[in-house]
């Protein structure tokens, strides 16, 4: 594949999408010619593309020519995108992101990471460890991609939405958990399970699943299945756990033997599990545990997952959490790192369908914070607001006063001393965060 496609230009329709931008960066670094098109609006992935010198064009049918290979983002269709419409009308073939990836990964020993939650952090941890030990290409769902022309290994994130992971047949895969999400597509937890079960059957050499997840205990695969977790009946067990304000220390036991002592500079119980999954996979794949331990220590995290900054002596955390399970994990991490601080959560629900389906669970998760503020629901491009749910409905279910804030007025957040602020959501919650940062900075200048 290397030789036959080097002369082609890959054109990405919707290049700012997190998976798409990561793939574009990876192909660029492998020596391929890459360009893409998208909307004008700023998205956090575009900085990496711009730094790499990858052209980002407006959507235009002129971009579709004989000499480009087309890769199309999943959200773009004939009825909402001029380039797709032009390609279909004129007989130009294109592959969806996941179709292209399924074909592309066959030239490597591939490591997949699937699961309802924790995919991106775990993919980041796995690729960080591997790239420091050997030549590895990878794609992370935070928009980060790295390509190496000599890589024999490929690490990627596998997304269950609309069963997008079905073209993938990895050598190894981790599945972090199974949970009901994407209610606009999946009808029930059983429907979600069947998708993961189908994916598991395509894994070839080893499947690593969280042992305390009752659904994952029912998963079947043609490859050997290894369970990881905190219990004695797991094949790889995290033990002797010490959680501190600088991260988490633990040992991993396999077949009654300690295979290594590890430290991750990450917070929350979920990150110990993510690291244990990575350790289990690399142990079975024959990697040196001393090297794995060495590189886990230097993992700096992935974009929009517990990303911290300090503005005017105030700690602000940005996180992609948009499901109750993720909110609980993020707040747990915040408490570990800042045990003496008030935890203020600012949450923006993402999609009306998810908010309706999980309203009570969201309220319960947000109860873990000391104070709660809510932003207006961020609707997806795939849905229409029928007025069936409002953010005030969520506020009413939270067992402490939950105020609704706007981008224009985030001043109620100033009512807290000795607090850290955790902004969570998958929509445009970063606009609220930026507004709060500007407010803090302006107060500083007037002091």
Curated annotation (Swiss-Prot):
Compartments in which it is found: Cytoplasm
Pathway participation: Cell wall biogenesis; peptidoglycan biosynthesis
Protein known as: UDP-N-acetylmuramate--L-alanine ligase
NCBIfam families hit by this protein: murC
UniProt source species: Streptococcus thermophilus (strain ATCC BAA-250 / LMG 18311)
One Pfam family in the UniProt entry: Mur_ligase_C
GO terms of molecular function: ATP binding; UDP-N-acetylmuramate-L-alanine ligase activity
Broad EC category: ligase
Main location, first listed in the record: cytoplasm
